[in-house]
UniProtKB/Swiss-Prot annotation:
Localization of this protein: Cell inner membrane
UniProt lineage: Bacteria, Pseudomonadati, Pseudomonadota, Gammaproteobacteria, Enterobacterales
One GO molecular-function entry: purine nucleoside transmembrane transporter activity
Gene3D superfamilies assigned to the protein according to its UniProt record, in alphabetical order: MFS general substrate transporter like domains
Record gene name: nepI
Ranges that cross the membrane: 22-42, 55-75, 86-106, 108-128, 148-168, 176-196, 216-236, 256-276, 282-302, 306-326, 344-364, 367-387
Organism, as annotated: Escherichia coli O6:K15:H31 (strain 536 / UPEC)
Chief localization: membrane
Membrane topology of the entry: Multi-pass membrane protein
Function (record text): Involved in the efflux of purine ribonucleosides, such as inosine and guanosine.
SUPFAM superfamilies xref list: MFS general substrate transporter (SSF103473)
PROSITE patterns the record matches: MFS
Protein name: Purine ribonucleoside efflux pump NepI
Keyword terms, alphabetized: Antiport, Cell inner membrane, Cell membrane, Membrane, Transmembrane, Transmembrane helix, Transport
NCBIfam families noted in UniProt: PRK10213.1 (NF007578)
Length: 396
């Protein structure tokens, strides 16, 4: 693959960024994220319409994450020599098909099939996103392009639930997914128009994905990714009970806190390219260290609403650096195997999200209200130490 990348760069060196293609990728990512979380705000009407409980309907989110984890691991092995332009178009088609299957679902099994299609698109798209980006812009512009893509993620995360809830009341949950299918069609046409041909890896250069973990610093990097995202979900999954019981926020106050977090996350993502240009390793070590301190502050003084709100804003600003930073690390330190590294990264993140939420929930129920914070802070501190000591970083 390294020879293949080198040959392509030599023959087709990128001198000007293809921003139209980058924005089409960002739009596709935003659509994937919005559709992933639409059921969260539509569970009740979906459950009532299909004659199932809300808990069972909630598995429509779980199955997407589960399929995405496995899709991310095996998609790069499956699409080796395929032009990545056609692969991205396929993912957009799967996104659209998923929405239509869910919209017309008359049984829980058809609903799950639709959501599984989304999982394949979600996991596959994230697996190739870093390598895709580095083939659309010059090396010096990669952090900026990644910040555009992750900025779209931040916006999608902020608007997905309230938009789904509002439109669900207005036009019904099935028509919400029909509207999402229309967005998928727009994705397809935009990608067809803007994304250039991006040849895949020749079949004779296939390599085992997991051999990457034998490279110096790669295993440490993946462990650091796991701990940082597990730390995030150990806390953020339970931000509602923590903020309502520790700081005394009501529903309206919590909504404003979450909105502030979302806006801060978008701002942090927008500023990430400037910070990462200075030092990727400093950002990847510094961000979790700041989050560890924030968890400590919230544990000690979180009963003060001003302090709690400030921590939420700082958390949103700071954590935004982490996903962009690790994708930048892949494009620089593992550029010759960016797709395979991306597939491992996505699987690690999905596993971390699941483990972080599960362990955080156990701690909340069995240890105490601030235990998710202490768990999160500990994981973030360990991440900062591991990055500082073991993670290797190549200069751009």
């Amino acid at each position: 693959m390294s020879e293949f990348i080198a040959e392509n760069r030599g023959a087709n060196a990128i001198t000007r960024p293809n921003w139209s293609a980058v924005f089409s990728v960002a739009f596709c990512v935003a659509c994937l994220i919005i559709v992933e979380f639409l059921p969260v705000s539509l569970l009740t009407p979906m459950a009532q319409d299909l004659g199932i409980s809300e808990g069972v309907a909630g598995q429509s989110v779980t199955v997407t994450a589960f399929v995405a984890m496995f899709a991310s691991l095996f998609i790069t092995q499956t699409i080796q020599a395929t032009d990545r332009r056609y692969v991205v178009i396929l993912f957009a088609v799967l996104l659209t098909l998923s929405c239509l299957l869910v919209s017309f679902a008359n049984s829980f099994s058809l609903l799950l099939i639709g959501r599984a299609c989304l999982g394949v698109a979600l996991g596959g798209f994230w697996a190739i996103s870093a390598s895709l980006t580095m083939r659309l812009v010059p090396p010096r512009t990669v952090p900026k392009a990644l910040s555009v893509i992750f900025g779209a993620v931040s916006i999608a995360l902020v608007i997905a639930a309230p938009l789904g809830s509002f439109l669900g009341e207005l036009i019904g949950w099935r028509n919400v997914f029909n509207a999402a299918a229309a967005m998928g069609v727009l994705c397809i046409f935009w990608i067809i128009k803007s994304l250039p041909s991006l040849p895949g890896e020749p079949s004779h250069q296939k390599q085992n994905t997991f051999r990457l973990l034998q490279r110096p610093g790669v295993m440490a990097g993946m462990i650091a990714i796991f701990m940082s995202f597990a730390g995030q979900f150990a806390f953020f999954t339970y931000i509602r009970p923590v903020y309502m019981n520790l700081a005394g926020f009501g529903v309206d106050g919590l909504t404003l806190v979450l909105l502030s977090f979302g806006i801060a996350s978008f701002v942090g993502t927008s500023l990430s390219s400037f910070i990462l240009k200075r030092s990727v390793k400093l950002a990847l070590a510094g961000a979790p260290f700041v989050l560890a301190l924030s968890a400590l502050v919230l544990t000690l003084w979180g009963s003060d609403k001003i302090v709690a709100t400030g921590v939420a804003i700082i958390w949103g600003l700071t954590f935004a650096l982490i996903p962009v930073g690790w994708s930048t690390w892949i494009t620089r330190s593992l550029a010759d195997q960016a797709e395979k590294a991306g597939s491992i990264q996505v699987a690690v993140i999905q596993l971390a999200n699941t483990c972080g939420a599960a362990i955080g929930g156990y701690a909340l129920d069995n240890i105490g209200l601030t235990s998710p914070l202490m768990l999160s802070g500990t994981l973030m501190l360990l991440t900062a130490l591991l990055v500082t000591a073991k993670v290797k970083m190549k200069k751009s």
